[in-house]
Amino acid sequence: MAKRLLPAHPGLFLQELMTEYGLTQYALAKAIGVQPIRIGQIVARKRAITPNTALRLARYFGTDAQSWLNWQAHYDLQVAQQTLESKIKRDVHPMKEAA
């Protein structure tokens, strides 16, 4: 079975924005009032974007928090599908239609 590629983590998009605006992780963290490690972990795809972070990023970049959360939810669902799909197909049987 061929290994599927993981979807893009929202940290990748955040890194692109930071590059576009010439921001360091430290500068962005300071600007939005979080610890630099939080930004570093998001960019490294080791941390999810929480509602708190989404609100801060949206305010700073002039975007909306829902978009940040949608990107994160999409990523999480794709990862879950790739890692759990066969187990769920094996363990969960569809409900039978009423006669």
Range-by-range predicted roles:
Residues M1-L23, N70:
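A short, Lys/Arg-rich alpha-helix, primarily the initiator
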Residues K46-R59:
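Short, basic-rich loop-to-helix N-cap that marks the start of a DNA-contacting helix
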Residues L23-Q41:
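Short alpha-helical DNA-recognition segment
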Residues L69-A99:
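Short, charged recognition helix plus adjacent turn
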Residues G33, A44-K46, A73:
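Residue-level detection of the helix-turn-helix DNA-binding "recognition helix"
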Residues M18, A29, A58:
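The alpha-helix within a helix-turn-helix
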